[in-house]
Amino acid sequence: MRALVLAAGKGTRMKSKIPKVLHPLSGKPMIEWVVETAGKVAQKVGVVLGFEAELVRKTLPEWVDVFVQEEQLGTAHAVMCAKDFIEPGDDVLILYGDVPLISENTLKRMIEEHRKGADVTILVADLEDPSGYGRVIQDGDKYRIIEDADLPEELKSVTTINTGFYVFSGDFLLRVLPEIKNENAKGEYYLTDAVNFAEKVRVVKTDDLLEITGVNTRKTLVWLEEQLRMRKIEELLENGVTILDPATTYIHYSVEIGMDTVIHPMTFIEGRTRVGENCEIGPMTRIVDCEIGNNVKITRSECFKSVIEDDVSVGPFARLREGTILKKSSKIGNFVEIKKSTIGEGTKAQHLSYIGDAFVGKNVNIGAGTITCNYDGKKKNPTFIEDGAFIGSNSSLVAPVRIGEGALIGAGSVITEDVPPYSLGLGRARQVVKEGWVLKKRKEE
């Protein structure tokens, strides 16, 4: 089985300089949805590109065969541009880059039905209002497709529409492609004409209208996003996740969340995030591409491409940047920013700190206002803080530097040299007190 994805259109009605198939749906480009699904049912996947072909090509996996339709002259013409992809002894599935939610199950049903002996298998659906769609007309054992504009009056009551998804026998498709003409109002070559050449046609019906919805406008894309969002939320609710306010909660379809986790309002969980069991997320929190363990609490914070182990507390108003690893039972408090750093088990950074390019051991206390000065104007340098160290408030650790195990840094210090284990590091001027100085100064004035 081969799958050919037609994705050459510009998407004029999207009013965008970005190719239509690259517009994201639930966090990933529409074409990525289709290619991933195609890869689950077909041994080889090809994509026909057109507008901004090179830009779209960059988003595709290396295992996808790419063909280019220089001039968009219809669906059959697009398939003709990929005729080298079609093998006489193999079947080919036709998909569309702007119909992103076609399901693996439906495609498998089509393939199974096709293998009962067919030139072509059509995916159809019944619509209450089929206006604008080509109708699938059955005449005994045969089927044909008539475009809406060409329907005679007596057939306008037919509600079975052609979705545009097909499985073709490779032999049949190669034979009929040269016979398709562009004798229509638009002067284009339509794949529906190939169906009308077929002697053996089989039909599969879908009742899920989401999976056959094509995106031609931003309005449709937003509608599809909302439907997908609510479908995901309902799935999570049914599997033991509490979502206190679905109307203000945005969860991408790729997200996984364990049971007994509570999601508060105004929470955004995106990308390939996995959240464990019995967590509390939000309110007003954004999490992107993170791995989160069990019993984690994150509130009013942002977390990007980070790993958060069990029993960790984050926030409020914390920011975890890419490369952050929070080990078990660590605590990250308000207005703490962490970037490309590992925070050890049981370590606390509770207030007003920046930790960048650092490796922090177990049970370290990082006082309020601590800064790792990691950038020297040319490159980022590492800071090492070993187990059990205590960093006093308002300290600056100028990297590269190492704070030894059990060492103590006095508050207000600027540390530029390594501090050995169990040592006191001070990097500040001695305090001077001049008694009565203020009164003396006033008398002089």
From Swiss-Prot:
Compartments, as annotated in UniProt: Cytoplasm
Location of the region described as N-acetyltransferase in the Swiss-Prot/TrEMBL record: 240-445
Positions annotated as active site in the UniProt record: H351
Function noted in UniProt: Catalyzes the last two sequential reactions in the de novo biosynthetic pathway for UDP-N-acetylglucosamine (UDP-GlcNAc). The C-terminal domain catalyzes the transfer of acetyl group from acetyl coenzyme A to glucosamine-1-phosphate (GlcN-1-P) to produce N-acetylglucosamine-1-phosphate (GlcNAc-1-P), which is converted into UDP-GlcNAc by the transfer of uridine 5-monophosphate (from uridine 5-triphosphate), a reaction catalyzed by the N-terminal domain.
Pathway: Nucleotide-sugar biosynthesis; UDP-N-acetyl-alpha-D-glucosamine biosynthesis; N-acetyl-alpha-D-glucosamine 1-phosphate from alpha-D-glucosamine 6-phosphate (route II): step 2/2; Nucleotide-sugar biosynthesis; UDP-N-acetyl-alpha-D-glucosamine biosynthesis; UDP-N-acetyl-alpha-D-glucosamine from N-acetyl-alpha-D-glucosamine 1-phosphate: step 1/1; Bacterial outer membrane biogenesis; LPS lipid A biosynthesis
Protein name according to UniProt: Bifunctional protein GlmU
Top-level taxon: Bacteria
Keywords of this entry: Acyltransferase, Cell shape, Cell wall biogenesis/degradation, Cytoplasm, Magnesium, Metal-binding, Multifunctional enzyme, Nucleotidyltransferase, Peptidoglycan synthesis, Repeat, Transferase
Catalytic activity: alpha-D-glucosamine 1-phosphate + acetyl-CoA = N-acetyl-alpha-D-glucosamine 1-phosphate + CoA + H(+); N-acetyl-alpha-D-glucosamine 1-phosphate + UTP + H(+) = UDP-N-acetyl-alpha-D-glucosamine + diphosphate
Gene behind the chain: glmU
Binding site for acetyl-CoA: A368, N374, Y375, S393, A411, R428
Region Pyrophosphorylase, residue ranges: 1-218
Residues the entry annotates as binding Mg(2+): D98, N216
Assembly and oligomerization: Homotrimer.
Location of the region described as Linker in the Swiss-Prot/TrEMBL record: 219-239
GO cellular component, one term: membrane
Entry GO MF terms: glucosamine-1-phosphate N-acetyltransferase activity; magnesium ion binding; UDP-N-acetylglucosamine diphosphorylase activity
Pfam (any one): Hexapep
